[in-house]
Amino acid sequence: RGLGDVYKRQDTNGVYADVMEKALYNGIISGISLDGTKFFYVNPLAVKPKAVKKDQRLIHVEPRRQKWFACACCPPNLARMMTSLGEYIYTTEGNTVYQNLFIGSDMKTEVNGKEITLHVTTSYPWEETVSVRVESMEDAAFEYAFRVPGWCRGMTVTVSYTHLRAHET
Protein backbone atom coordinates (compact mmCIF):
# COMPACT_ATOMS: atom_id res chain seq x y z
CA ARG A 1 0.00 0.00 0.00
CA GLY A 2 1.19 3.49 -0.81
CA LEU A 3 1.24 6.72 1.15
CA GLY A 4 -2.01 7.71 -0.55
CA ASP A 5 -3.72 4.69 1.03
CA VAL A 6 -2.48 5.72 4.46
CA TYR A 7 -3.76 9.26 3.98
CA LYS A 8 -7.13 8.15 2.62
CA ARG A 9 -7.67 5.82 5.56
CA GLN A 10 -7.08 8.68 7.96
CA ASP A 11 -9.43 11.17 6.37
CA THR A 12 -11.71 10.88 3.33
CA ASN A 13 -12.43 14.61 3.04
CA GLY A 14 -9.41 15.29 0.85
CA VAL A 15 -7.26 17.37 3.20
CA TYR A 16 -4.32 14.96 2.95
CA ALA A 17 -4.66 14.71 -0.83
CA ASP A 18 -4.57 18.54 -0.95
CA VAL A 19 -1.19 18.33 0.80
CA MET A 20 0.01 15.64 -1.63
CA GLU A 21 -1.04 17.85 -4.55
CA LYS A 22 0.79 20.90 -3.18
CA ALA A 23 3.93 18.87 -2.57
CA LEU A 24 3.79 17.35 -6.05
CA TYR A 25 3.31 20.57 -8.00
CA ASN A 26 5.19 23.05 -5.79
CA GLY A 27 8.04 20.93 -4.50
CA ILE A 28 8.64 17.76 -6.45
CA ILE A 29 8.18 18.54 -10.13
CA SER A 30 9.41 22.10 -9.74
CA GLY A 31 12.76 20.67 -8.62
CA ILE A 32 13.58 19.29 -12.07
CA SER A 33 14.09 21.15 -15.34
CA LEU A 34 11.70 20.48 -18.22
CA ASP A 35 14.38 18.55 -20.11
CA GLY A 36 15.14 16.43 -17.02
CA THR A 37 18.86 17.24 -16.89
CA LYS A 38 19.13 19.83 -14.09
CA PHE A 39 17.88 19.86 -10.51
CA PHE A 40 17.40 22.01 -7.45
CA TYR A 41 19.11 20.05 -4.71
CA VAL A 42 17.47 22.23 -2.09
CA ASN A 43 14.02 23.72 -2.46
CA PRO A 44 14.15 27.30 -1.21
CA LEU A 45 10.61 27.95 -2.60
CA ALA A 46 11.81 31.28 -3.98
CA VAL A 47 15.22 32.24 -5.32
CA LYS A 48 16.48 35.77 -5.73
CA PRO A 49 19.96 35.33 -7.25
CA LYS A 50 21.36 38.62 -5.90
CA ALA A 51 20.08 37.88 -2.38
CA VAL A 52 21.61 34.37 -2.43
CA LYS A 53 25.06 35.82 -3.14
CA LYS A 54 24.82 38.39 -0.32
CA ASP A 55 23.20 36.33 2.47
CA GLN A 56 25.51 33.84 4.22
CA ARG A 57 22.47 31.91 5.50
CA LEU A 58 21.70 31.01 1.87
CA ILE A 59 25.19 29.85 0.92
CA HIS A 60 23.89 26.31 0.23
CA VAL A 61 21.20 27.61 -2.18
CA GLU A 62 22.10 27.68 -5.85
CA PRO A 63 20.11 30.28 -7.82
CA ARG A 64 19.79 27.93 -10.83
CA ARG A 65 19.11 24.22 -11.23
CA GLN A 66 22.36 22.23 -11.24
CA LYS A 67 23.52 19.35 -13.43
CA TRP A 68 23.80 15.86 -12.00
CA PHE A 69 26.76 15.40 -9.69
CA ALA A 70 28.54 12.37 -8.20
CA CYS A 71 26.66 12.17 -4.91
CA ALA A 72 23.17 12.99 -6.13
CA CYS A 73 20.24 11.71 -4.09
CA CYS A 74 17.47 13.98 -5.39
CA PRO A 75 17.28 12.79 -9.03
CA PRO A 76 16.81 9.10 -8.10
CA ASN A 77 14.21 10.07 -5.49
CA LEU A 78 12.34 12.13 -8.10
CA ALA A 79 12.41 9.15 -10.46
CA ARG A 80 11.16 6.83 -7.70
CA MET A 81 8.35 9.25 -6.87
CA MET A 82 7.25 9.62 -10.48
CA THR A 83 7.21 5.85 -11.07
CA SER A 84 5.05 5.30 -7.97
CA LEU A 85 2.65 8.14 -8.83
CA GLY A 86 -0.21 5.71 -9.51
CA GLU A 87 -0.25 4.79 -5.82
CA TYR A 88 -1.00 8.42 -5.01
CA ILE A 89 -3.47 9.17 -7.82
CA TYR A 90 -5.86 6.33 -6.98
CA THR A 91 -6.66 4.22 -3.95
CA THR A 92 -9.30 1.57 -3.51
CA GLU A 93 -11.11 0.26 -0.48
CA GLY A 94 -13.97 -2.21 -0.70
CA ASN A 95 -16.17 -1.21 -3.63
CA THR A 96 -14.92 2.40 -3.66
CA VAL A 97 -12.33 3.83 -6.03
CA TYR A 98 -10.86 7.10 -4.73
CA GLN A 99 -9.30 9.60 -7.10
CA ASN A 100 -6.94 11.62 -4.92
CA LEU A 101 -5.07 13.55 -7.60
CA PHE A 102 -6.25 14.78 -10.99
CA ILE A 103 -3.58 13.55 -13.39
CA GLY A 104 -4.17 12.23 -16.89
CA SER A 105 -3.89 8.46 -16.51
CA ASP A 106 -5.47 5.06 -16.92
CA MET A 107 -6.20 2.81 -13.95
CA LYS A 108 -7.24 -0.81 -14.21
CA THR A 109 -8.56 -2.48 -11.06
CA GLU A 110 -11.03 -5.06 -9.86
CA VAL A 111 -14.14 -4.08 -7.90
CA ASN A 112 -16.61 -6.67 -6.62
CA GLY A 113 -14.87 -9.29 -8.77
CA LYS A 114 -15.29 -7.26 -11.97
CA GLU A 115 -12.51 -5.54 -13.87
CA ILE A 116 -12.92 -1.83 -14.58
CA THR A 117 -10.68 0.73 -16.24
CA LEU A 118 -10.79 4.45 -15.54
CA HIS A 119 -9.47 6.71 -18.30
CA VAL A 120 -8.76 10.19 -16.94
CA THR A 121 -8.03 13.06 -19.33
CA THR A 122 -7.04 16.48 -18.03
CA SER A 123 -4.62 19.38 -18.32
CA TYR A 124 -5.00 20.07 -14.59
CA PRO A 125 -3.65 22.18 -12.88
CA TRP A 126 -3.41 24.52 -15.88
CA GLU A 127 -7.04 23.84 -16.80
CA GLU A 128 -9.72 22.80 -14.33
CA THR A 129 -11.67 20.34 -16.50
CA VAL A 130 -11.26 16.64 -15.69
CA SER A 131 -12.88 13.96 -17.84
CA VAL A 132 -13.32 10.40 -16.56
CA ARG A 133 -14.43 7.53 -18.78
CA VAL A 134 -15.27 4.18 -17.18
CA GLU A 135 -14.76 1.03 -19.19
CA SER A 136 -15.93 -2.44 -18.17
CA MET A 137 -16.75 -5.60 -20.12
CA GLU A 138 -19.62 -6.34 -17.74
CA ASP A 139 -21.83 -4.28 -15.44
CA ALA A 140 -19.79 -3.32 -12.41
CA ALA A 141 -21.41 -1.49 -9.50
CA PHE A 142 -18.92 0.62 -7.55
CA GLU A 143 -18.53 4.01 -5.92
CA TYR A 144 -16.26 6.57 -7.52
CA ALA A 145 -15.08 9.08 -4.93
CA PHE A 146 -13.11 12.06 -6.15
CA ARG A 147 -11.51 14.78 -4.12
CA VAL A 148 -12.90 18.27 -4.23
CA PRO A 149 -9.75 20.37 -3.73
CA GLY A 150 -9.84 22.62 -0.68
CA TRP A 151 -9.37 25.69 -2.87
CA CYS A 152 -12.31 24.79 -5.16
CA ARG A 153 -15.39 26.99 -4.67
CA GLY A 154 -17.53 26.03 -7.66
CA MET A 155 -17.67 22.48 -8.95
CA THR A 156 -20.01 20.77 -11.38
CA VAL A 157 -20.32 17.05 -12.07
CA THR A 158 -21.73 15.88 -15.38
CA VAL A 159 -22.49 12.24 -16.18
CA SER A 160 -23.66 11.46 -19.71
CA TYR A 161 -24.60 15.13 -20.23
CA THR A 162 -26.64 15.21 -16.99
CA HIS A 163 -25.59 17.55 -14.16
CA LEU A 164 -25.43 15.82 -10.77
CA ARG A 165 -24.88 16.86 -7.18
CA ALA A 166 -21.85 15.32 -5.57
CA HIS A 167 -22.03 13.90 -2.04
CA GLU A 168 -19.50 15.41 0.33
CA THR A 169 -17.92 13.23 3.01
Regions found by a protein language model. Give the residues of each.
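Catalytic cores of secreted or luminal carbohydrate-active enzymes
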Residues: P44-H119, Y124-P125
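Catalytic-core region of carbohydrate-active enzymes that cleave or remodel glycosidic bonds
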Residues: D5-D35
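Conserved small/polar residues in nucleotide/adenosyl-binding loops
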Residues: G2-Q10, T162-T169
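Beta-rich accessory regions
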Residues: T91-R165
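Short, solvent-exposed turn/loop segments enriched in Gly/Ser/Thr/Pro and often Arg
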Residues: R1, S33-F40
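Well-ordered alpha-helical segments within folded domains of soluble proteins
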Residues: R1-K8, P75-S84, E128-V130
